[in-house]
Amino acid sequence: MVATAASSAFFPLPSADTSSRPGKLGNKPSSLSPLKPKSTPNGGLQVKANASAPPKINGSPVGLKSGGLKTQEDAHSAPPPRTFINQLPDWSMLLAAITTVFLAAEKQWMMLDWKPKRPDMLVDPFGLGSIVQDGLVFRQNFSIRSYEIGADRTASIETVMNHLQETALNHVKIAGLSNDGFGRTPEMYKRDLIWVVAKMQVMVNRYPTWGDTVEVNTWVAKSGKNGMRRDWLISDCNTGEILTRASSVWVMMNQKTRRLSKIPDEVRNEIEPHFVDSPPVIEDDDRKLPKLDEKTADSIRKGLTPRWNDLDVNQHVNNVKYIGWILESTPPEVLETQELCSLTLEYRRECGRESVLESLTAMDPSGGGYGSQFQHLLRLEDGGEIVKGRTEWRPKNGVINGVVPTGESSPGDYS
């Protein structure tokens, strides 16, 4: 019916009683040409017809007198000659038809049920990733861009860390737990609570190169009474080779007071259904990080300040930025000849916009093998500790120093 109404605005339909031969006065004339007017018989008296056709409503002529002669009233009420302009469609009818079409389409759209039927069918329509493994694992692919590689044509450690952070946030979003778009559940939002990372461990088996496509799988699990663990596996999309393993521990902080908080029961009820009962993909490195200061450090870089773009929506420096600052004090000869293969960071406090920091690095004498190990400290000028860390390095194009944990600790087969 909508299509008929729309088409009738462009092409008026003929009346059912239309005839091709000349008929009595009131029937549709056989020709509308104003160049050849015809006369109409009426009781033996012939009167030349006006060039204009009788007015019509719904295809039937109306408003004519029973006699063939026109009265003075008829002469004044006769319509103007039919021209190209006055034979255009009725735009009000056309507008009404278009409006009807759009309203019908909108109604059909709203009636569709877009809710996923199964947890493993949760898919982001914008291509940000998908939920797999019975709704417990989030998967997303990334292509390595030219601006994400370093001098050796491989992805930087910052690129890897950005992929970890992006998938963590998208996981919360696609699972329907994000209230403000940045990792907070509705109950967390009500209580001004945010997630902050307490510890991060990363093991890199191989860095992808420009043009490679990597697949990132991530999931969450319980960590103690008031913590949450998030694990990642990064693999090569073409070969399935595991490139990177990462594990982290997160705790809650009140956004207004900037103090750590216990997980409220309401928040726990939101997140626990998404927990995976699985050990971490990396064995926890519980070695105590030694104290580092000016006397014990081999290299110190001072005067580091955050830029505006280094802040996240929680108004503190993004945790990925800390890695770049830590590497600022790493010896240049190490950066040129070796690559980072293992990273452990312990976050002590947040860093704000006005902070001025110092980066301290010392060689770890306990490190063995053919690579290097370093202790790191990122602190404020007044001595307050921001991040403590340990890094392990291997010769470039070499293999990782030590055994990479097998996939037995992952929650399932992700193929």
From Swiss-Prot:
Compositionally biased region (Low complexity): 1-16, 24-41
A single GO cellular-component term on record: chloroplast
Annotated active site: 314, 316, 351
InterPro entries: Acyl-ACP-thioesterase_N, Acyl-ACP_TE_C, Acyl-ACP_thioesterase_NHD, FATA/B, HotDog_dom_sf
Subcellular location per the Swiss-Prot or TrEMBL entry: Plastid, Chloroplast
Signal peptide from the UniProt entry: none
Record keywords, A-Z: Chloroplast, Fatty acid biosynthesis, Fatty acid metabolism, Hydrolase, Lipid biosynthesis, Lipid metabolism, Plastid, Transit peptide
Region ranges (Disordered): 1-81
Pfam family, one: Acyl-thio_N
GO function terms (MF aspect): acyl carrier activity; fatty acyl-[ACP] hydrolase activity
Gene3D superfamilies with a match to the protein in the record: Hotdog Thioesterase
Reactions performed catalytically: hexadecanoyl-[ACP] + H2O = hexadecanoate + holo-[ACP] + H(+)
Transit peptide endpoints, chain numbering: 1-60
Assigned EC number: 3.1.2.-
EC category: hydrolase
Database matches in SUPFAM superfamilies: Thioesterase/thiol ester dehydrase-isomerase
CDD domains membership: 4HBT (cd00586)
Record function comment: Plays an essential role in chain termination during de novo fatty acid synthesis. High thioesterase activity for palmitoyl-ACP versus other acyl-ACPs.
PANTHER family: OLEOYL-ACYL CARRIER PROTEIN THIOESTERASE 1, CHLOROPLASTIC, PALMITOYL-ACYL CARRIER PROTEIN THIOESTERASE, CHLOROPLASTIC
Family: Belongs to the acyl-ACP thioesterase family.
This protein's name: Palmitoyl-acyl carrier protein thioesterase, chloroplastic
Organism: Cuphea hookeriana
Gene responsible for this protein: FATB1
